[in-house]
């Protein structure tokens, strides 16, 4: 059986190192002796059930580690289930019982170090490049044994669409990019050209060939196929590493781009500059024959540069972008790849790109900023020195990315330990069940305190285009090293709320100087318009987004301000100012004032706000109303709050819930779920948004109806069912936060119980 291990490094591994003794680290290991016959049967039933129901619920319920933890905690649900017949008859006691059931279940899932584990995956282009990299370097069988490969194959099979292709994410229609990547992944994992479950390979290959073959794969795919030797570098758009040599004042300099754009281009430019091609093995030669419609040697690669499958085209290239690529391809690249510029300029640029790669690797303990970047940087390090320590340090951190669930083994974005824990702690605090949850809060508090970044990036970090990170929290764990504004704000809120509770119950409060560092970080990420960015200050002009080379994602080139980040920061700063009124008083007050103006300015005509990190308008409206309420705005005094409430009330479903399709994100307009369905997590967000705006005092009936849905949807053990994915990034791709289905319904019930029953208010 597979077992989740926590907070462990290998003391004998000189290539593995940590800033806080691996607190929050999650790795999976296969133990052939683990589990009773009954436990193994339960795992197999979870796998079978997912496969049977995958057309209805595309995301896994993340059951394997939950089974493990519940057994280790000897969890048994002793609080009877609650069912509500009529929303008007809902009582404080009903809400309390349901809340206690959910909190007791969720508390049993807390890790020993205080965080809540959980999957953060969903995109179907994460795993294949890792397999490609290890295949090229000759480490595939060393890193992944038979059990690993069995679970990887399970994951690929589980998410193949009926038409034979794979989507951008598990809920998406098939696209060329992910279909090609997953087909090659299957072949490298040992499946034959007509092999795989239910003729998986044959069906996928037919999907590809019916749409013109792999020459129609989008830009990122063309790069990976060129690396593998299934495509030719001359058919890709140029990514000259010489861009690193440009002066930083140039508008398109990588120093100015969004950190994720910069971190992808960094190793890609190195690979492009090297024109690296992996070993041309018999399998690669077979793939050339299988995936092209004409002989490989007869393909006109220059013509294929602009070929893209229509299924992949979310962000078509503007004319100006194609003109730039053509200029670089026709005039610039021939100069840079021939003497003397190949020696004078190209080699210097490659060395500088590698310098940046090593710097980012070291500062993230070889986790890197995310899984896409991780694989590219690891491959670049191997090319630079196949037997070097840099590559070996990368290999040591691969387990940090792997996750196993009933739908198999997948590669995660990187981890959401801190993000999930910050919300979980706030939900449990809101439950007012401290007599039952003191130990849980104490462990969560301890995890948050140990996970704060305590220093800035090493050396002259500004020359490496990095921002301050001291005082921040990451999305995952401290070793990751990348500051995020909303993760920092939510963690800061936790620390401040816990500081108001007895130390003997929740542990000692955080040192004020560390809180000051967090505030300093948050203030540094506010723009002139009052909005708050996610990772770094805005450095690029908005028009640079026209240069986005990735056809299936958007908002990729320039950092920008986000409603959710701004709201989280407002809430954290307001609470901080209440507890530390003499620290940077004027600066913080002005920051809050400007942030509120930003939130008001970002509201849509229908009263909603657009969400960048969750689906979508409901998510951002919850955040925005919370930020406005924290700053003292009310339904009576704020038109923005009144309009936000109107949006939520007019989108409530007949069953009392809310349900928004992920299509709202790419379409940038509110689209309800098909079939008038509700989603419990989105329902929870709407409840909390309405409570922020004082709905309980005006008319609690909409809240009662929504609470009834949540309570009646609770499962026998206190869990909640997995439904549609509600996380998103880069406007067009979903991200599955598996703990959300517990955290937010519990949090909403907690806030509802406090707000909707006047006679029980303290």
UniProtKB/Swiss-Prot annotation:
PFTB repeats lie at residues 99-141, 149-190, 441-485, 515-560, 592-632, 641-682, 703-744. The keyword rRNA-binding does not apply. The active site is at 486 (proton donor). The gene is LUP5. GO terms for molecular function: beta-amyrin synthase activity. Its EC number is 5.4.99.39. It catalyses: (S)-2,3-epoxysqualene = beta-amyrin. Component of the oleanane-type triterpene saponins biosynthetic pathway. Oxidosqualene cyclase converting oxidosqualene into beta-amyrin, generating five rings and eight asymmetric centers in a single transformation. It comes from Barbarea vulgaris (Yellow rocket). Keywords: Isomerase, Isoprene biosynthesis, Repeat. GO terms for cellular component: lipid droplet. This is Beta-amyrin synthase 1. PANTHER family: AMYRIN SYNTHASE LUP2-RELATED, TERPENE CYCLASE/MUTASE FAMILY MEMBER. CDD domains: SQCY_1 (cd02892). One of its GO terms (biological process) is triterpenoid biosynthetic process. Belongs to the terpene cyclase/mutase family. Pathway: Secondary metabolite biosynthesis; terpenoid biosynthesis. The record marks 419, 613 as: Transition state stabilizer.
